[in-house]
Each structure stands twice: as C-alpha cells, then as structure tokens.
Swiss-Prot record:
Catalytic residues (UniProt): K60
Name recorded for this polypeptide: Orotidine 5'-phosphate decarboxylase
Domain of life, source organism: Bacteria
Keywords: Decarboxylase, Lyase, Pyrimidine biosynthesis
UniProt GO MF annotations: orotidine-5'-phosphate decarboxylase activity
Family: Belongs to the OMP decarboxylase family. Type 1 subfamily.
NCBIfam families in the cross-refs: PRK00230.1, pyrF
Pathway(s) where this gene product acts: Pyrimidine metabolism; UMP biosynthesis via de novo pathway; UMP from orotate: step 2/2
PROSITE patterns: OMPDECASE (PS00156)
EC number: 4.1.1.23
GO cellular component terms, A-Z: cytosol
Native species: Staphylococcus epidermidis (strain ATCC 35984 / DSM 28319 / BCRC 17069 / CCUG 31568 / BM 3577 / RP62A)
Binding site for substrate: 10, 31, 58-67, 117, 179, 188, 208-209
GO BP annotations, alphabetical order: 'de novo' pyrimidine nucleobase biosynthetic process; 'de novo' UMP biosynthetic process
Amino acid sequence: MRNLPIIALDFKSADEVHTFLNKFNEPLCVKIGMELFYQTGPALIKSIKKRGHDIFLDLKLHDIPNTVSKAMEGLARLDIDLVNVHAAGGIKMMEEAKKGLRKHNADIKIIAVTQLTSTTERQLHEEQNIQTSIEEAVLNYARLTKKAGLDGVVCSPLEAKMISKELGSDFLKVTPGIRPKGAARNDQQRITTPEEAKTLGSTHIVVGRPITQSEHPIDSYHKIKESWLS
C-alpha cells in the first residue's frame, strides 16, 4: 500500500465512485467499506484496480475462526492491497484469517481494528464492560494482533505513538479520525490533523468526508497529501 492518504469512498453506488475518481489524474489509495462493497461486490474492485489505484477493503471481519478463514480465502482472490478483521475476535480468529488469506495471496497486508474512533470511554466502560482506559484497551488489542502475526492495526492517531513504542515502528498503524484544521468532527471522537498523525507515528491515514464531500475534492486531497508527506 503506497504511503498516500487513503480516501474513504463512502458512496452508495459504483456510478458515484467513478464520478468521483474521474476527477483525479493520478494513482490513489482508496478504502472500500461495508456499505459500498455489499452494494457493488467484487466488480467495483476490478474496475478501480484497472485505474491503477491501491485498495484497502475495510470489512472488519469478526466471526468464528473457521468462518473468517474461509471468507479470507475468497477475499484473497480479489486484487486488493489491505484487508482487516476485528481484534476482538481473538488470537485464534486472527491467525486463521491470515492462514486463509495466505492460501491464495502472499502479498495482501492484513490488520486488525482495535477500537473504533467513534468509541468514547463511557461506551467502553458501560457498553463493552471494559474497565480500563481506551488507550490500554487499544494497546491490549494491538498486542494480541502482533502475537497473531498480523501486519498492524487500525487505531486512532492518538494511540499510534504508544503502539510504536511497544510493538515497533514497522507495525502498521492505519489511522482514521483524520480532520484538517477547522473541519467538522462528524461522528469521529478521537481525531487529529494529518500533521499530528504523522508526528504521533501513524503509518497510513484514512480520510473520507473532508475530501469526498468537499466542494473542491482535488484541492482538498492535495492539501491533505501535502501536509501528510511534508
């Protein structure tokens, strides 16, 4: 996966995606989430790859180990660069996910979601019944992910530094919750700017609405790209 900002393609149809991508004349890194993949299926991945873009397939698989392994065997046949599971599924599930993926593809990176960037500490305590800080909960899931042999995690940029310190800078930290200065928070809770994410140790950033819903998406993308790569 190239070290470019990953654009979250939060659209409802393939037509909307292609209308958006037609604005760009350069290779991009894009994220296809559940909403879009379940609407369009593998056909959209093929058409995006023909354009020369890198793809993060963000399905956050979480099921019994055998089911996730078989699902990954199918996803391994797609021309994607990065895929993920939920770390809450446990070490065995993550190990089987990687085994399923590797049966057909040795190049796709696989990472695990720690805590969603929309999660608050109140939700962590009251709804998930995890009685630690968000930081400790995220670090615990990151440790399990590393032990399972995966390539990295999805986390907030705010947790990237401590994960790098304990698990190494090469361990991927793919971080959503990125907002340029002055941008709306939306449903994200633990957010930073692209510059802050880089300083904190993020290896990749994911940006959606500040680009896709911008009146000038190309300009917005290039500003974020410049601040991330500078």
